[in-house]
Amino acid sequence: MAFQRPYLDAYCTNKHLSLNQHSFKASLGMRVPLLAFFLLYLCSCISVVFAALPITMKAVQVTDPVHFTNDAEFKSSSLHLIGTHKDSLLVDSTVTGLIPALSYSTDVGLAGGLIWSKLSYGQQDPFRQNIAVTALASTKGLAGFNFFLDQPCSFNCVDRLIVNLVGNRFLEDQYYGVFTDQRIELKKNPKRFEYQSFTIKVNLEYRISTNNLAHKNETLFNNLNGFLSTDFQYKTPWNNDDTQLIMLEKPTGYAGAYGFWLGLGGLIDTRDSEFYPRQGWYSKQQVKGSLKSVLSNFTQTLFLSDTRYYQEFKLILPIVFAQRISYQWSNSNANTPYWSYPTLGGEEFLRGYVDNRFLVPQFWATNTELRTWLYESTNYGLKIGGTLFMDSGSFTDGTIASGDWSANVRYTAGFGGLVSLFSPDFILRVDLGFSEEGYGIFFSTGMLF
């Protein structure tokens, strides 16, 4: 959960649905001093069935033992404490978490939120079902709701269904212009960049594994998935006055717009864990498009590329080097709503810039992190860690070959904290990023990538 321009948009239209990277976010704007407190309380109830040896052997056939030996490191002293011994295997368990959150800032006002999540492991890898529900509201008019479902073996045991539903009402949404490459002084007149908006989003992704296909390279095919996706978004600004930038520029979509995208793609995932990867790599490539005649009032084509690499090494403590390289391209033009452009800034890319800072036809971006756990209490299933990160990115309105990429390079850097409570797969994260225009603070659940 976060507060930098309260965003319940866990997935924007032109962003990937990521396995267990689901973040519930908003943020505490970079334009004002930090005047917020964040209160978290987690109530977790876990019922664990300890496996006898025959059951353990059966479970190993359908799960990745490395995932469990790395991530299920609990010490069990009673049924009321969480977990199993380090050499035990979680065969059937359910983790339920409840997080109330309270924050105050001059931008958002007094905001309250609630995250409820349920993670059922079952006898399959990585889990049987992952459900999360988020609600958020503030005294200045923010209201939002988010439902997320990740369901492996939804229709058969080689598929996976991901559903994401978002509805929100903002009184202080952000618009900084389309393809704005000049530095913005946010402190002078921050209200100029704000506007009121209402948004509904529906994201569906259906994945099919190729691990049943006969092929010489069995390792590759066991980690290869193809997928189909559908996305719908409706967004409309409302009741804004002529002093706000969005009403002065009146970009396409300022009076409301909607789009429906169909997509297809493939991904390879060799990570040892989807929640806190230590080794392996991940690559997802996707093409999606909308047609004006099919539930859309504009036509658009998008290409999304996301590749990640993880390597653990030891320097006094075990440290994970994590690297993500992303590229997004669209044929966006004057008929494309401003909110459907690929976007740099905010929590995903260039932490330290505000959300929606750069609305551009195409961009590349990198995230580089060093992650480590600094303290662990096996009695309470508690781990505390930290991160150091550097982000970079660039954008252009030209072609890949002729675009002026070097003139638009941006950098941010920062650090963060990690807390794992009760379950090693439930991680709270806070990032503090710095840019030439200010800073950004992001509270979220799960690793960024």
Model-derived regions: residue spans:
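Gram-negative/organellar outer-membrane beta-barrel architecture
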Residues: S88-L98, L102-Y254, Y258, I427-R429, ...
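Hydrophobic, lipid-facing positions within transmembrane beta-strands of outer-membrane proteins
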Residues: T96-L98, L110-L114, A143-F147, F198-V202, ...
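Sequence/structural signature of outer-membrane beta-barrel proteins
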Residues: L119-Y121, L136-L142, S154, N168-E172, ...
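Transmembrane beta-barrel domains of outer membrane proteins
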Residues: S117-L119, D150-P152, N203-S209, G265-D269, ...
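Cleavable N-terminal export/targeting peptides
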Residues: M1-T84
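C-terminal outer-membrane beta-barrel translocator/porin domains of Gram-negative envelope proteins
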Residues: L262-I384
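Outer-membrane beta-barrel transmembrane domain signature
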Residues: S229, T236-F260, I316-P318, F363, ...
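Short loop/turn motifs that connect adjacent beta-strands in outer-membrane beta-barrel proteins
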Residues: H85-T94, Y121-Q129, S154-R160, T210-N225, ...
